[in-house]
Every structure is written in C-alpha cells, then in structure tokens.
Amino acid sequence: MTLTKADLADLLFEQVGLNKREAKDMVEAFFEEIRMALEAGDSVKLSGFGNFELRQKSERPGRNPKTGEEIPITARRVVTFHASQKLKSKVEEAYAGAST
C-alpha cells in the first residue's frame, strides 16, 4: 500500500475533524512549505521523523550503457532524506513483529 496526500487529507478529516477542503489545504500547505525551504537552500528537520537536506554532487564521468560512450554527468544539487533513529526503530519494530 502507498500512502498518498489524499490519504493524509482523509486522515485529518476523520481524526481531527477538519472538513475535507481544510484537510486537503493543510496537507498541500505542509508540503509546499517543505518544498519552498528546500528551494531556498534550507534543510528541513522534522523531529522524530527525519531530515531533508540538499547535497551538492560534483561532475563525474558516466557511460552510455548501450554504446559504452563516456559522457559527463553534470554537477547538481539533490535532495536527500535521512530517517531519524526514532523512525528507524519504529519501522524495525513493526517489521520484526510482522515476520514472527
């Protein structure tokens, strides 16, 4: 199963009591704030969940797998996510419980 933004909005509707429009707007605003922070070059730290950070990747040589031709992969910034230890532990516990 995949958790979507629509699922998150439904959960806010059911568990918090927001109307569907408010719930959808809140989810959209949350992700928009994360996107804007990353675009501005800021890290995003969500306590107990994890960190979104920007990382600079240097130019490096690459290879076309079909032709074997060497092509440069340009330098770029990428978004990385590092799960918090708390999140990792919870997922590990849930996975360990499911396999027994």
Swiss-Prot record:
Membrane-spanning intervals of the chain: none
Cited InterPro entries: Hist_DNA-bd, Histone-like_DNA-bd_CS, IHF-like_DNA-bd_dom_sf, IHF_alpha
Single GO BP term: DNA recombination
Alphabetical list of CDD domains matching this protein: IHF_A
Keyword terms of this UniProt record: DNA recombination, DNA-binding, Transcription, Transcription regulation, Translation regulation
Highest rank taxon of the organism: Bacteria
GO cellular component, one term: cytosol
GO molecular function annotations of the record: DNA binding; structural constituent of chromatin
Role description: This protein is one of the two subunits of integration host factor, a specific DNA-binding protein that functions in genetic recombination as well as in transcriptional and translational control.
Quaternary organization: Heterodimer of an alpha and a beta chain.
Protein name (database record): Integration host factor subunit alpha
